[in-house]
From Swiss-Prot:
Alphabetized GO MF terms: translation elongation factor activity
Biological process annotations from GO: peptide biosynthetic process
Taxonomic source organism: Klebsiella pneumoniae subsp. pneumoniae (strain ATCC 700721 / MGH 78578)
Signal peptide (from-to): none
This protein's pathway: Protein biosynthesis; polypeptide chain elongation
Chief place where the protein resides: cytoplasm
Name this protein carries in UniProt: Elongation factor P
HAMAP family, per the entry: EF_P (MF_00141)
Length: 188
């Protein structure tokens, strides 16, 4: 893999630090009037998703990480692993609960997901930005009940719980933003 110096760090670059892959989220190159130039870099640890801020001297370097994002189709969950398929090669990959994280509640059969691979192993799964799910349980909305503006909780077909407006009923299909977990709209 390529070697990157700290002044080459840009948002989106994936590098290796301490034997683990990191993604550069922001980089600021600082050249003080006195002393050596340095880069203040915000990184995201790809294995856990935690954010770290580090300072690199201008002479510091890091190895590029062998990290690949692939568009794969979600097939099914067998209880232990979530299975995905590459639509071009029909090759199947299995991701464990650690790679899926909280995103399991947004996965629908045949949904296009972005699977992040490191050394050929899935380390993160990103569902589509928006999913359409059916409401299977929610309190009935009472006519004229507009005192509270907060809405009500609704359980969706995948088990996710989302706050929805009072007018939404059981059996309706709604659009949800998977990044924030918020209700977007009803689907006609």
């Amino acid at each position: 893999m390529a070697t990157y110096y700290s002044n080459d760090f840009r948002a989106g670059l994936k590098i290796m630090l301490d034997g683990e892959p990191y993604a550069v989220e922001a980089s600021e190159f600082v050249k003080p009037g006195k002393g050596q130039a340095f880069a203040r870099v915000k990184l995201r640890r790809l294995l856990t998703g935690t954010r770290v801020e580090k300072t690199f001297k201008s002479t510091d370097s890091a190895e590029g990480a062998d990290v690949v994002d692939m568009n794969l189709t979600y097939l099914y969950n067998d209880g232990e692993f979530w299975h995905f398929m590459n639509n071009e090669t029909f090759e199947q990959l299995s991701a464990d609960a650690k790679a899926i994280g909280d995103n399991a509640k947004w996965l629908l059969d045949q949904a296009e997901c972005i699977v992040t691979l490191w050394n050929g192993q899935p380390i993160a799964v990103t569902p589509p930005n928006f999913v359409e799910l059916e409401i299977i349980e929610t309190d009935p909305g009472l006519k004229g009940d507009t005192a509270g503006t907060g809405g009500k909780p609704a359980t969706l077909s995948t088990g996710a719980v989302v706050k929805v407006p009072l007018f939404v009923q059981i059996g309706e299909v709604i659009k949800v933003d998977t990044r924030s977990g918020e209700y977007v709209s009803r689907v006609k």
